[in-house]
């Protein structure tokens, strides 16, 4: 009798252990923060594995945004979009980065404008260090219009020498159409769209009552053809570093545009994770560039 009881207890223990193991094996993975700076070293390792080595570098700036938005608007907006996108499609998001191109706003208080040498060197060091830590797919998510030439140029210069990682640039911040009707036609900086998005990302920093205290109108102080570029073009048109009318902003427009942005970044993350061609082509290119005379059509 005693033997039967012991045998039954033994079998029940094995069965319960088996069920526990099965439950643990099908349990969803533990939630990991998408914030680089919030992860422990061990969790960072797991995050790299879970993200398939895909990391985001949200790129902002410190500059005046009209009379009503904070200096860090671009950084606050792009990080809001990137962090929410990474929650949808897991990726590790690098901490605050604002070391970009903003020479055109050096006359305004609070602007931090680094030299072109520093911008490129620091960005290269940053992506190199991200890759050394396992981020073999670095997506730079741009939040600042003044970086629109800098970032593609930086990505192109990655062909200068071999790298074991790929730099991708994502530079769409608003949909071309759809959503609530806009009230303004000029809307390039701190205007209706950007103010609306900040009403979603950081409404506590928006001073909508100040939006009409300065002019965001185009001053048309140059008379050059559209295809003739000069660095002073922005200051010539918008000397107040304000383009548009932020007082027209609404939360409805902000939610539509921010939701679109988050979804677009999430789609970009998925596409980059699935990309198994770019690094192979980079390596092929590096090898061929050593012996250009051997390259055949």
Residue ranges and their predicted role:
Residues 24-117, 121-137, 145-297:
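Extended, histidine- and acidic-residue-enriched regions that form the cofactor-binding/catalytic faces
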């Amino acid at each position: 009798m005693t033997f039967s009881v012991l045998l039954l207890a033994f079998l029940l223990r094995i069965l319960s252990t088996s069920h526990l193991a099965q439950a643990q094996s099908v349990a969803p993975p533990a939630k990991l923060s998408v914030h680089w700076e919030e992860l422990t070293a061990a969790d960072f390792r797991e995050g790299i594995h879970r993200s398939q080595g895909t990391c985001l570098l949200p790129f902002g700036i410190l500059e005046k945004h009209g009379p009503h938005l904070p200096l860090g608007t671009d950084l606050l907006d792009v990080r809001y979009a990137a962090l929410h996108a990474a929650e949808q499609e897991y990726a590790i998001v690098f901490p605050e980065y604002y070391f970009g191109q903003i020479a055109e706003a050096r006359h305004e208080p609070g602007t931090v404008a680094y030299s072109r040498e520093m911008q490129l060197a620091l960005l290269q060091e940053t992506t190199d260090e991200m890759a050394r830590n396992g981020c073999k797919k670095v997506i730079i998510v741009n939040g600042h219009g003044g970086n629109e030439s800098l970032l593609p140029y930086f990505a192109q210069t990655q062909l200068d020498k071999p790298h074991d990682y790929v730099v991708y640039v994502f530079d769409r911040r608003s949909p071309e159409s759809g959503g609530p009707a806009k009230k303004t036609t000029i809307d390039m900086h701190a205007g209706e769209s950007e103010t609306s998005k900040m009403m979603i990302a950081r409404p506590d920093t928006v001073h909508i009552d100040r939006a009409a205290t300065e002019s965001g109108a185009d001053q048309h102080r140059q008379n050059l053809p559209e295809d003739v570029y000069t660095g002073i073009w922005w200051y010539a048109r918008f000397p107040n570093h304000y383009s548009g009318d932020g007082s027209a902003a609404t939360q409805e427009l902000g939610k539509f545009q921010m939701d679109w942005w988050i979804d677009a970044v999430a789609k970009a993350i998925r596409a980059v994770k699935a990309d198994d061609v770019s690094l192979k082509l980079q390596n092929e290119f590096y090898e061929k560039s050593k012996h250009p005379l051997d390259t055949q059509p």
